[in-house]
């Protein structure tokens, strides 16, 4: 699944009074670029602090502050393995105190510390260093169900819409575990020449996912160009 589509599918469905939290990493990129705020929606993220592991705790705090509003957390799998899974236990403990039970933890599951991988490529010209960047695979939906929450796993893009519909209508907190492509570049449209040069050096330096990087990078830039022309 293209990670941009995860947030794009959410944006057209999310209630006007929802609170959205985003963890640090590439999840924050897609939150900023693809979610359209409206109504009384509110958003929260760590900003320039870039603190990993904040997404699920922020969501829990939002539910305590506004127990009558739906909450959505956008979190990477690296942050989930840092502390997010432990925070799901906290969520399960206190969920019955919330007037509106809807609390969705959407996990961008790519088995990669993705933001740092792309920082190495775009800022350091270094190929992905798998020993430090790859993280263990697991089923976050299964873990959620094991502690009394709901869980949905998504592998294909055409499953996303119905999965979001189900998650946003759940009667208790739910984990939406979306397997997504780590090679979609979280690079802004105004990427500098130095960033492009460094990324090219990373490709030439033997990045293990070089071909997919090139394909997804070209697709992303072509889509941005097409949108710009339509505007």
Task: For every predicted segment, state its role.
Residues 1-63, 226:
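Active-site diphosphate/adenylate-binding microenvironment
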Residues 41-47, 73, 117-131, 145, ...:
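Short beta-alpha connecting loops at secondary-structure transitions
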Residues 166-231:
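Glycine/aspartate-rich loop-and-adjacent alpha/beta segment that forms the canonical ThDP
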Residues 65-166:
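Conserved thiamine diphosphate
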Residues 24-26, 109-112, 179-184:
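Glycine-rich beta-alpha junction loops
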Residues 30-36, 55-57, 84-87, 115-121, ...:
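Short acidic, glycine/serine/threonine-rich loops at helix termini
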């Amino acid at each position: 699944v293209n990670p941009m589509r995860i947030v794009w599918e959410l944006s057209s469905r999310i209630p006007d009074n929802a609170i959205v939290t985003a963890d640090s990493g590439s999840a924050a990129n897609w939150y900023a670029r693809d979610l359209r705020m409206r109504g009384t929606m509110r958003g929260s993220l760590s900003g320039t602090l870039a603190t990993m592991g904040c997404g699920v705790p922020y969501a829990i705090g939002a539910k305590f502050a506004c127990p009558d509003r739906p909450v959505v957390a956008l979190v990477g799998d690296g942050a989930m393995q840092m502390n997010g899974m432990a925070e799901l236990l906290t969520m399960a403990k206190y969920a019955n105190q919330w007037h509106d039970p809807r609390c969705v933890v959407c996990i961008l599951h790519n088995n990669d510390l993705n933001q740092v991988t792309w920082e190495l490529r775009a800022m350091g010209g270094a190929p992905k260093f798998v020993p430090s960047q790859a993280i263990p695979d697991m089923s976050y939906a299964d873990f959620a169900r094991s502690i009394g929450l709901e869980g949905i796993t998504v592998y294909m893009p055409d499953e996303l819409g119905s999965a979001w519909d189900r998650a946003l209508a759940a009667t208790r907190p739910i984990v939406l575990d979306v397997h997504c492509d780590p090679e979609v570049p979280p690079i802004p449209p105004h990427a500098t020449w130095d960033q492009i040069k460094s990324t090219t050096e990373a490709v030439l330096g033997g990045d293990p996912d070089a071909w997919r990087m090139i394909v997804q990078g070209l697709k992303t830039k072509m889509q941005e160009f097409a949108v710009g022309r339509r505007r």
